């Protein structure tokens, strides 16, 4: 398997882990009765600060993973895999792994810098696919 596809697969598994890290405390914060409901009403109380941060980090990864997936597909189908695109794939993965604790624990300015590494890696992959 191309290294970019391996990084994408591992990034998806990071997403699953993030979902679990968020869902468990969210069920405790909001109660299982609410989380199993159709959610037609507002939550009975807000999420705890840490749980809310994990939720925002999860949503951010959904957004970032879309662009990274496009980059991996274009590089792979375009037969443009190279040491540069492989390095970018691993950089994206490392950034997404580090982003979770950075967001959860409020590491400033590191959270934004880590996010930037992931976006830059994705952008470089897209540009490399065009060259």
What are the residue ranges of the model-derived segments?
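Juxtamembrane boundary at the C-terminal end of a transmembrane helix
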Residues: 82, 124-131
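Core segments of transmembrane alpha-helices
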Residues: 59-72
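Interfacial loop-to-transmembrane junctions
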Residues: 97-120
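Transmembrane helix-loop junctions in multipass membrane proteins, especially transporters and channels
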Residues: 23-31, 79-80, 108, 131
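N-terminal signal-anchor transmembrane alpha helix
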Residues: 1-40
């Amino acid at each position: 398997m191309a290294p970019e596809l391996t990084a994408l697969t591992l990034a998806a598994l990071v997403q699953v882990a993030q979902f679990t890290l968020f869902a468990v405390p969210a069920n405790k914060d909001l109660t299982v009765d609410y989380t199993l409901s159709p959610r037609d009403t507002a939550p009975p109380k807000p999420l705890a600060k840490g749980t809310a941060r994990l939720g925002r980090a999860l949503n951010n990864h959904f957004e970032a993973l879309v662009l990274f997936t496009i980059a991996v597909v274009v590089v792979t189908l375009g037969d443009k895999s190279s040491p540069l695109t492989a390095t970018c794939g691993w950089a994206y993965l490392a950034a997404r792994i580090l982003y979770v604790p950075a967001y959860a624990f409020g590491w400033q300015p590191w959270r934004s810098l880590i996010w930037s590494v992931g976006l830059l890696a994705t952008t470089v992959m897209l540009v490399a696919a065009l060259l």
